[in-house]
Amino acid sequence: MGQSFSRWLERQWYGHTGWQLILRPFSWLFYILIALRRLAYRLRLFKSLKLSVPVIIVGNINVGGTGKTPFVIWLVQQLRQNGWYPGIISRGYGGKSIHTHQVTKDSLPQEVGDEPVLLVQRTGLPLYVGRKRTRAARHLLRDYPECNLIISDDGLQHYALERDMEIVIIDGERIFGNGQLLPAGPLREPSSRLEDVDAVVFNGGPPAAGGYLMQLIPEDLRKVSAPQERMALNELIGQHVHAVAGIGNPQRFFGQLEQLGLVVEAHPFPDHHAYTEDDFEFAKDDIVLMTEKDAVKCIAFARENWWFMPISAEIDRALAEKILARLTRLMEKEI
């Protein structure tokens, strides 16, 4: 039921159907509500928390994943190489926990969300999740006073937290879908919102003027049940694999595998899907290949021939220089 509805929604948002016209009046109402809410924050009718350290928001204006996680990993690498010690906060989408607490590499994805667990495993940084990002940020800085910067994974629309930089990630293949706001389309805010942000990063596809291109580079496969074991991707060229993806745009993953020469039988799932062993009845003893985000949720019941494909982001060095220069100016103001 959930998967069917999710796929139906995507067809409406990224296609051209009559449902868009029916839902459009609700989108106009949604626009009025979000415009009034943002105005209230600008007029300081609603309070925003100003932290003692710089805050970088990495978000999007679309519903669903656009590639924020690999970007955050890249951003952490750039910052660490230049002397910064960031902490990360997240809403923890897909997790059941209602409390604010720290995520560790052994945290359960079903409790804290799949992306936070993956980020901790890949970066080793302190990361706190919570329904209120302001509270998560406070807890993080209290427990890790050595952190001198906060990265908010998502949270572009969370105006209760003041920010020093906003970076938006866009799916370069699907862009804005039909261009409509929720519920007629996939947009949380109108595309004009991009005029106010500091940088726009396109995950694949040619970037628009002034934007930055992010390319996702596949690495050696790792075994889901024993990530220390590796296998070169070229060992599977020409072989049939069951490809599993519960991400914002599963077709991107499937297409990437096909371009690499694999014979792909695709199994798309909704973003943040909570996998069970029953989801893999199709697999039998065949090879299963999934994303790293999916793998963190399948370790408990993974079979011997299940593998995941880590990816790393490559982005124009000019963006890193822009971010670092902005942070330098911010720190000079504090002195």
Curated annotation (Swiss-Prot):
Coiled coil: none annotated. One of its GO terms (cellular component) is plasma membrane. Transfers the gamma-phosphate of ATP to the 4'-position of a tetraacyldisaccharide 1-phosphate intermediate (termed DS-1-P) to form tetraacyldisaccharide 1,4'-bis-phosphate (lipid IVA). Pathway: Glycolipid biosynthesis; lipid IV(A) biosynthesis; lipid IV(A) from (3R)-3-hydroxytetradecanoyl-[acyl-carrier-protein] and UDP-N-acetyl-alpha-D-glucosamine: step 6/6. Keywords: ATP-binding, Kinase, Lipid A biosynthesis, Lipid biosynthesis, Lipid metabolism, Nucleotide-binding, Transferase. Belongs to the LpxK family. GO terms for biological process: lipid A biosynthetic process; lipopolysaccharide core region biosynthetic process. GO terms for molecular function: ATP binding; tetraacyldisaccharide 4'-kinase activity. It comes from Methylobacillus flagellatus (strain ATCC 51484 / DSM 6875 / VKM B-1610 / KT). It comes from the Bacteria. This is Tetraacyldisaccharide 4'-kinase. ATP binds at residues 62-69. Pfam families: LpxK. Its EC number is 2.7.1.130. It is an enzyme of class 2 (transferase). It catalyses: a lipid A disaccharide + ATP = a lipid IVA + ADP + H(+).
